[in-house]
């Protein structure tokens, strides 16, 4: 969950202002996890990993990062796996498919268009429920949630 929280804050900042100031990410993470030096340090380590992987880039100013490489994800099994990982950090283990796949924590990825039923076909650990004409709810299968 910690990595997802840092990725979410970085993705939100990229959408809002186009840059990711490390101090803002650290402050927001400390609001969630407590004002301890270890929280701030670990957030910095996660950001450094994002830099090492190329999904964030150094900008001209120290401690301010910009969008790096965006990875196109077309493999349905990989999309299902990433969706499942995102569900594990959500309370209740469920969420609307569109919201989930467009979430800020997935800022390094561009997903191929997918249908909800194809995700459940790609993973035996996910269920899909239709909520309306154009709304699908993705959930972790019950037997999986306590493992």
Where are these regions (language model features)?
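Ca2+-coordinating acidic residues in Ca2+-binding motifs
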Residues: 24
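Long, low-complexity, charge-rich intrinsically disordered regions
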Residues: 140-147
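Short helix-coil junctions and helix-kink-helix linkers
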Residues: 27-38, 98-114
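Short, amphipathic alpha-helical interaction segments positioned at domain boundaries
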Residues: 2-3, 70-97, 147
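Short amphipathic alpha-helical interaction segments
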Residues: 36-49, 108-122
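A glycine-rich, hydrophobic loop/mini-helix early in the fold
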Residues: 1-20
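A short, conserved structural fragment
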Residues: 51-61, 123-133
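Accessory beta->alpha helical hairpin/"wing" motif in late/C-terminal subdomains of nucleic-acid enzymes
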Residues: 58-74, 136-137
């Amino acid at each position: 969950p910690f990595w997802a929280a840092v990725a979410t804050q970085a993705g939100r900042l990229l959408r809002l202002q186009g840059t990711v100031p490390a101090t803002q990410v650290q402050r927001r993470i400390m609001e969630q996890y407590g004002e301890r030096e270890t929280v701030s340090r670990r957030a910095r380590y996660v950001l450094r990993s994002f830099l090492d992987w190329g999904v964030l880039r150094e900008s001209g100013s120290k401690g301010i990062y910009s969008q790096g490489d965006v990875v196109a994800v077309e493999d349905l099994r990989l999309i299902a796996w990433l969706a499942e990982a995102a569900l594990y950090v959500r309370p209740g283990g469920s969420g609307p498919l569109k919201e989930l796949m467009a979430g800020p924590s997935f800022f390094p990825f561009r997903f191929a268009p997918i249908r909800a039923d194809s995700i459940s076909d790609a993973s035996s650990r996910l269920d899909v429920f239709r909520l309306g004409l154009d709304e699908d709810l993705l959930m972790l299968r019950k037997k999986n949630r306590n493992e």
